[in-house]
């Protein structure tokens, strides 16, 4: 169930606004637009199905069901004038759609970033830009797109590794992201969109001497000739034989 709670009021006064007569096995996730006007509920059922609903809190009209029994997962990323959808519907490695609040129905969604051979892991909106994190050959990549899905640039990461959590606000020109690797302790960076650069905010303290550790990515073929990626982590200068 989803309840509306107003800060400062007793929880007993909370009003149930979603889930009446819904499947008890559904798990609702909630997103709200920056203006606070449009509320989304993504009712997930397992890892294959979910239905997406939207409600205009200003007009208080009935819920609009944007998807109905569609095989796929949907993540709503609200922005000021549009909302974006990250989904694996007909795209196992995910893609991005763009839609308006005025015409939010599924048939009006426009694909702006198609599926590629790499997995799209996360999507964030920052100051009218789309920040995408992807997994490419077991390595994280970080990209900046404009709000229509045109690639602007790739953010250079410190080394081969994994991008973790990305935290952003829609109306500011920077965002935070975490990064770590075999020879790079977990670090939080602040990336400035205007300056096109990042600064280190925090790094996990450790006594290990990471400068003495070398990381290489190599490829080999499995029994059925499938290419397999493997990382070699060893002391710098070690002769491999």
Where are each of the predicted segments found?
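Peripheral, non-catalytic segments that deliver or gate enzyme domains
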Residues: 1-240
């Amino acid at each position: 169930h989803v309840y509306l709670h107003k800060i400062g009021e007793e929880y007993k006064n909370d009003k149930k606004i979603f889930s009446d007569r819904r499947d008890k096995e559904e798990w609702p996730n909630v997103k709200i637009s920056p203006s606070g006007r449009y509320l989304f509920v993504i009712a997930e059922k397992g890892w294959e199905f979910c239905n997406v609903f939207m409600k205009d809190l200003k007009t208080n009209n009935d819920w609009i069901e944007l998807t109905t029994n569609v095989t796929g997962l949907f993540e709503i990323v609200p922005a000021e004038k549009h909302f974006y959808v990250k989904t694996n519907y007909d795209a196992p490695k995910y893609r991005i759609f763009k839609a308006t609040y005025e015409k939010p129905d599924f048939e009006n969604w426009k694909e702006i970033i198609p599926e590629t051979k790499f997995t799209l892991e996360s999507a964030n909106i920052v100051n009218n830009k789309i920040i995408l994190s992807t997994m490419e050959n077991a390595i994280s990549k970080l990209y900046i797109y404009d709000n229509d899905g045109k690639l602007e640039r790739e953010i250079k990461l410190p080394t081969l590794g994994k991008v973790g959590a990305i935290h952003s606000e829609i109306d500011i020109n920077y965002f935070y992201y975490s990064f770590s690797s075999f020879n790079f302790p977990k670090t939080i960076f602040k990336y400035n969109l205007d300056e096109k650069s990042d600064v280190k905010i925090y790094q996990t303290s450790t006594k290990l001497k990471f400068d003495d550790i070398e990381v290489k990515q190599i490829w080999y073929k499995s029994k059925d000739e499938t290419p397999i990626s493997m990382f070699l982590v060893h002391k710098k200068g070690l002769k491999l034989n």
